């Protein structure tokens, strides 16, 4: 069992205290998820003896599955972990806001939602991916950031070989136009 992401961050108020941020990305509804968050939280605390902030990014397609706590009581003792969650599905209703948001996180959220929406239609996925690639070039980001974000999009929004070749052709044409 390994955490998805663990980062050591300094607080902005100038204090010297460290907080470990545990970000768990969950792609499917699992009944034991909240318990796993609890287990990771206490294991991280046991190892580092520092404050742990456990955060959950829910990337599943189940609207009502929203775990946010785990705890238990026994013989007068109790313990609980309450953790904040972000549900990517919540952003599906306002995709226009994601398209216009300049944040790379909005673009990746949009890619995730479009990947889920186009599971059965590769032509629609191609069109969605091409639109996101065009956004990458329009945002004015640096070359490395465009490359990094494209790598994420390419990994998330997989295409059959023929459509992949078409996408690369479109990208080559776009890059030629950008040079002009």
Where are the model-predicted features located?
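Conserved single-residue anchors adjacent to enzymatic active/cofactor-binding motifs
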Residues: 1-162
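Long, amphipathic alpha-helical segments that form or neighbor coiled-coils/leucine zippers used
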Residues: 150-180
């Amino acid at each position: 069992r390994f955490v998805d992401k663990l980062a050591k961050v300094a607080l902005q108020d100038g204090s010297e205290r460290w907080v470990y941020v545990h970000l768990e990305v969950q792609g499917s509804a699992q009944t034991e998820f909240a318990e796993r968050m609890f287990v990771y939280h206490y294991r991280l605390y046991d190892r580092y003896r520092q404050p742990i902030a456990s955060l959950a990014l829910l990337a599943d397609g189940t609207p009502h599955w929203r775990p946010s706590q785990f705890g238990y009581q026994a013989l007068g003792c109790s313990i609980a972990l309450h953790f904040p969650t972000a549900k990517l599905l919540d952003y599906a209703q306002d995709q226009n806001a994601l398209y216009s948001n300049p944040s790379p996180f909005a673009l990746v959220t949009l890619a995730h939602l479009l990947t889920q929406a186009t599971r059965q239609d590769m032509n629609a996925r191609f069109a969605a991916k091409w639109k996101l690639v065009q956004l990458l070039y329009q945002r004015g980001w640096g070359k490395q950031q465009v490359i990094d974000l494209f790598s994420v999009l390419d990994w998330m929004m997989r295409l059959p070989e023929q459509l992949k070749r078409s996408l690369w052709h479109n990208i080559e044409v776009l890059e030629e136009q950008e040079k002009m």
